[in-house]
Amino acid sequence: MKLPLISILIPTVPERVEQLIQLTALLFNQSTGLPVEILSLSDNRARSIGMKRNALLHIARGKYIAFIDDDDTVADDYCATLCDMAKVDVDVLCFNQISRWNKEESIVEFRIDHAIFGQYMPAGITKRFPWHVCAWRRELAQQCVFTDKQWGEDADWVMQAFELARVEAYSPKILHYYAHMDEASLAK
């Protein structure tokens, strides 16, 4: 069996099963015929999100890996665009994101020459180093470890990845949609 180009990794919790079903249906529909594997990991909250991310990363087989949280969504051409971008040999596949932090929205431009924690620019463009939602070369991603915690594990991981990325492919498309609402967060 041929290895996939892209592994999409989705950590989840039982409280978000309906959102997971919608997300995986969207991904299954758009990945038909493409070299994409979609993996999710749910449990009874015995593992932190950091440990779930590490477990998914360990079993991923794609040339590139990208995480999508169960309460996020992606563009209709997410899989096709990443597969097209993955034809080149780079460290990370970068793109743009719509980020909603509580009621403030920003376009996030992920590029390797941006700061890790670029200033959030409501109603503007936030420039950030590529986080775990971008598609990272698996061998590089596996050199980094998500910390065993429920919140902030992604920031800990990206600070390690920052040292490894040298070459990117970039699409100006908005491929990922992130939404955070303090009152709805399950990261406790």
Q: Whereabouts are the PLM-identified features?
A:
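Short, acidic, metal-binding catalytic loop of nucleotide-sugar glycosyltransferases
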Residues: 3, 22-35
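Glycine-rich, basic loop-to-helix element that forms the pyrophosphate-binding segment
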Residues: 44-60
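Short aromatic/hydrophobic "clamp" motif used to bind/position activated sugar donors
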Residues: 65
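The conserved acidic donor/metal-binding loop of glycosyltransferases
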Residues: 69-73
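Conserved donor NDP-sugar-binding/catalytic core segment of glycosyltransferases
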Residues: 79-108
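A recurrent flexible, glycine/aromatic-enriched loop bordering the glycosyltransferase active site
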Residues: 115-136
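Acidic donor-binding loop at a coil-to-helix junction in glycosyltransferase catalytic cores
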Residues: 151-157
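Catalytic donor-sugar/metal-binding loop of nucleotide-sugar-dependent glycosyltransferases
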Residues: 160-177
